[in-house]
């Protein structure tokens, strides 16, 4: 009988602790007179009516697990009903932030849930705000990680930046007319339902980053989606409203479930990393209205197969499709003049690319390790390649270089292990370090008369290389190991009358055999009587002076033209 009574008493005691404590105040700053020090850590459910100021919120914060100076307390308050309360100016600072050379004190204002008022109050689960509140301040409920329900009255017209960030809210509906602020629901991983007002024009930075939302209806008035606005969320599909002009940096980056994006026909800007690491995205049909497509915008989209780039685009930015290893099809618009570094690096399924006439430069590692690419035909307009731009394109069997190139840079075509022949065009002056190194099947190389320098290891580790044709009348300067580890029975073909020079030149003298070959359609520059020169061009058709060396085309007053070498 005694045991039964004791058990019942314990149960009744627990029930009392869970029961709502009701406090009525006549004067702000007197909450501590109603709740004693002995009680404050025992109350889990509290309802307050009457005025509250900063002094009262010191106690409420303490009861909810965080003291005035943001140190953890033993508070256990889970449910707080302030429906019939009001917030008034006055009292002590409810929160003191220490930092740098100055401390910041936060005081209450009339009808406002203040800045960081309940920041990191980890025990709060259910809060009902006063019906007179008009604003919720920045970081008000930041990191209230147990807060799953928040009743916000219609009187609230503003919710501050990061006010509800890292809470456990499962659904949220912004009232019509309310602007969305930066990071307002950032990191709310439990948030599965979200309603955005129909008149919103901007979704700012971090607003819904890291949330659990899978579907969202974007308002028809929307013009901009800000930086990281939906990043790392669980969104599966995006339908861009016709009003949308800008998708900013990282707006949908790291969204692992995003499979479909329907762009509108007025979109102008897709920012840096906008869809980076969206590993389920399959296709990107970018409208022709887009004029700015930022760096890494679709990088590491590991399932992306098909892309349509907008006509009018002038530059493919850095790492735009870096590590999109399933990308099979992409167009490069005729208007593109520049392809940035890493633009298509590690696109393992990309078997063909058509480069437009007008393309001027290709950046560092731009097509590195595109190991199914079969052909590289560079336009005549291209005058600049950067380091390792086609390094590791193992299945390329045909390379056509541009006559506008002056230098083939370091590692540009190294490890292109299927290429058998390379014909370097007239106009190239320098072949860079390891430019054609480790091309396992390379057998024949033609070096033009304009080349003056071969940098170290430029043709090294080409074990099948048996035939090198060098048209330079003066042996080009060679760096260390320029032709190291080529076929043993190798032959160097040089212009008529230059064999002795090559036999005594460093590196060239190491060839097993040196053979002179007759040049065709090229004459030594000679003087003809009664005929004078009217124009002179280089091999690319550009007008030059008579002080230039190399292969030239000279027009004479009698109407004849002569291809000559000077």
Which residues does each PLM region occupy?
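A recurrent domain-boundary module in secreted/ectodomain proteins
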Residues: 503-521
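Short, T/G/N/S-enriched strand-turn elements that build extracellular solenoid repeat scaffolds
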Residues: 30-39, 55-65, 162, 194, ...
